[in-house]
From Swiss-Prot:
It comes from Sus scrofa. The keyword Nuclease does not apply. The gene is PNMT. This is Phenylethanolamine N-methyltransferase. It comes from the Eukaryota. Coiled coil: none annotated. The lineage of its organism: Eukaryota, Metazoa, Chordata, Craniata, Vertebrata. Its EC number is 2.1.1.28. Pfam families: NNMT_PNMT_TEMT (PF01234).
Length: 283
């Protein structure tokens, strides 16, 4: 669903599965700036209305981190895409953050922002909004400074491999928490592949650790420049079942219906889900 915050992270690499190989090939045409324009500039990037999709996602994340239960030392963002908003509330709770993406162009886009280089996408509206809803009196500059300081590395990832980060990864493993936004459904050719990808990333998480998963509901395609990318449509119950099969207790699962004025023709998304799940001890 390129709809709202997706990080459609092209986390599929060519391997023995022809469906996954086709996904990986399609993502070679992914244009990060077009994706950002479609989803993070107005109208979807308008954060002034509390009913908008952007405020909803940021609120879900902020409220979950405000519980104090999702914390630790190391967090991995799975399939970051070219976006950083999904970590704005997380960065106060983890001192070592790893961002990941299959596509080099997305990793380069993230690097521009982290290094504060000219031409980097401006996330300050998102940072300001997070500071507002968290209510700690923090400035957006302080928020962004903290996030930049705590992102220690940007790594390649392939969620369709049993070891998504490869062997000898530089990320501290197992992580205390995972975040993933608009990745798994956007890079999986079918529901079985989605389930396997979820199983694979779960190996990166310690027992008792937390997964915050954001994704598209009932979406089959989205645009990112010249690329028209297929998405496996999932419903709320399928997400819940997949999490249970991967060994999670679902702590919270919320859904958002995409309003008509935000259905802008860049995808066919019907809604968004936010899941907070905890990996069962012993899994």
């Amino acid at each position: 669903m390129s709809g709202t915050g997706q990080s459609h992270a092209a986390d599929a690499a060519p391997d023995s599965d022809p469906g996954q190989a086709a996904v990986a090939l399609a993502y070679q045409h992914f244009e990060p700036r077009a994706y950002l324009r479609n989803n993070y500039a107005p109208p979807r990037g308008d954060l002034s209305s509390p009913d908008g999709v952007g405020p909803w996602k940021l609120r879900c994340l902020a409220q979950t981190f405000a519980t104090g239960e999702v914390s630790g030392r190391a967090l991995i963002d799975i399939g970051s895409g070219p976006t950083i908003y999904q970590l704005l509330s997380a960065c106060a709770h983890f001192e070592d953050i790893t961002m990941t993406d299959f596509l080099e162009v997305n990793r380069q886009e993230l690097g521009l922002w982290l290094r504060e280089e000219p031409g980097a996408f401006d996330w300050s509206v998102y940072s300001q909004h997070v500071c507002l809803i968290e209510g700690k009196g923090e400035s957006c500059q302080e928020k962004e400074r903290q996030l930049r300081a705590r992102v220690k590395r940007i790594l390649p990832i392939d969620v369709h491999q049993p070891q998504p980060l490869g062997t000898g990864s530089l990320a501290p493993l197992p992580a205390d928490a995972l975040v993933s936004a608009f990745c798994l459904e956007a890079v999986s050719p079918d529901l079985a592949s989605f389930q396997r990808a979820l199983d694979h990333i779960t190996t990166l998480l310690r027992s008792g650790g937390h997964l915050l998963l954001i994704g598209a509901l009932e979406e089959s395609w989205y645009l990112a420049g010249e690329a028209r990318l297929a998405v496996v449509p999932v419903c709320e119950e399928e997400v819940r079942e997949a999490l249970a099969r991967s060994g999670y207790e679902v702590r919270d699962l919320r859904t958002y219906v995409m309003p008509a004025h935000l259905r802008t023709g860049v995808d066919d998304v019907k809604g968004i889900f936010f899941a907070w799940a905890q990996k069962k001890v012993g899994v």
